[in-house]
Amino acid sequence: MITFLSGGTGTPKLLSGMPHNADTVVIGNTGDDIEMGDLLVCPDLDTVMYLSSGILDRKKWWGIKGDTFGTHDYLVELAKERGWDGNPNFLKKNEQISGKRIANWRRFSGGEEFMKIGDRDRLFHKLRSRLIEEGKTLTEVTENLCSVLKTDVKLLPMSDDPVSSILQTDLGEMHFQAFWAGWKGKPEVENIEFRGSETAKTTRFVVDALKNEVIIGPSNPVTSIGPILSLKGIEELLSETKVVAVSPFIGDKSFSGPIKKLMMAKGYEANTSGLMEMYPFVDVFVIDSNDKTRIDRPMVRTDIRIDCKSDAMRVYEACLKAFEKMEKK
């Protein structure tokens, strides 16, 4: 059995190369989760859930293929009629810590929908929110939704407690989704905080899953994997098992997302060397054949670009070779 740490689109693209019905557990990042109005949106969980059930829109790598956006478009139209400027409306501090705890520091106005949500996708967010209100944990709700969709992996949220990726920027404090989906990654980033991680707890399911061999896919190491690592005890658990990480870099170039800006804000070089510094518990890295970064850690080289299923299969096979290189822990 293999456990993946997943967030964003990097690890899901790698997962697309897994053999069908492989014995796989995925621990999903929830630092990107937000609440807009009455919708609890869990983007990184949803991407894996939709991928493993065969309904993911693989052109965008988010949302449901063939979805429509009538409700979203009309909400935006109404908001603009009321004078909305199109920017995210992150609620004030006193509103962030009132209501159900899972939405703490994740609350945005529901009347100003800066994130594009499809009509079918919206129904899953609505169902998730209703089940949470009925007293179920996020782990229980995720299991319920995966059962409905007949997913072929076991998907676990990193925690049932709220952890929010909060960025300090030149425009002020903002949630990661405001920075990325709202402001398109344009603000300058000064620091990143995983708010709530100091009190959030891992579940026993996550602890058990981290006893398996672990693969960290080529996801953003700061905001896709960082929230998972910020939880108490996670890095210690990873240091006790076999871990392979796939670099999201070819030299100083990353495949997608605001990795460079975010790694520099955390004080790391935005390249494979910086990644290795961020992941001291990793045993073997899978890096690109053309990556000229000087490396003093065990590695396997391959073409790490993932544009199709055969690419994903190639990178996954490189991960298996990486496990073969390790001594027993």
Tell me what each language-model feature is:
Residues 226-266:
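Redox- and metal-dependent alpha/beta enzyme cores, enriched for Fe-S-associated oxidoreductases
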Residues 25-29, 242-249, 284-289:
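Short internal beta-strands
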